[in-house]
């Protein structure tokens, strides 16, 4: 099933309902959709949660009559060494977040020089990211694609 931002979906496992306001996709073929629940209390913002498309069923048109879903372009930077135009930081583009209401962000993984330390992740607005002119390393996303959706999804990126 194609998930369309702005529509309301229900998780078939938990019954959680919300409007799809974004998608996080990773280079290794994992996509999770962000559902923002409606609050019963005026001015209270509930926390969004992430779900896989196979977990979701369409409930209604949500706010799709008020907000047009963005056109999602191919992820041109996946697997490429990229540079943040603002800070000059280099990293491998491993994912992106696409929002219903604002610009997309690419996710760069910055590998520390000491490989015993954890990698750092930078979420950067798409306008800040450019491919490195002389990359030291690149990888075809097909080389790291998992057999099943969700392979390798880092738990620290969960929104709930």
Write out the residue ranges for each language-model feature.
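Intrinsically disordered, low-complexity, charged/polar segments
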Residues: 41-72, 113-160
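Basic/aromatic-rich interaction segments and small domains that mediate binding to polyanionic partners
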Residues: 2-4, 8-55, 72, 81, ...
């Amino acid at each position: 099933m194609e998930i369309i931002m702005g529509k309301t979906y229900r998780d078939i496992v938990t019954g959680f309902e919300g409007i799809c306001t974004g998608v996080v996709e990773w280079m290794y073929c994992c996509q999770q959709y962000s559902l923002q629940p409606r609050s019963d209390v005026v001015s209270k913002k509930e926390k969004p949660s992430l779900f896989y498309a196979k977990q979701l069923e369409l409930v209604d048109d949500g706010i799709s009559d008020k907000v047009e879903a963005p056109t999602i372009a191919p992820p041109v930077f996946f697997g490429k060494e990229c540079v943040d135009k603002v800070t000059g930081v280099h990293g491998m583009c491993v994912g992106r977040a696409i929002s219903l209401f604002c610009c997309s962000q690419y996710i760069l993984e910055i590998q520390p020089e000491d490989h015993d330390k954890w990698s750092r992740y930078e979420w950067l607005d798409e306008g800040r990211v450019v491919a490195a002119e002389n990359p030291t390393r690149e990888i075809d996303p097909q080389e790291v694609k998992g057999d099943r959706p969700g392979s390798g999804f880092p738990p620290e990126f969960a929104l709930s």
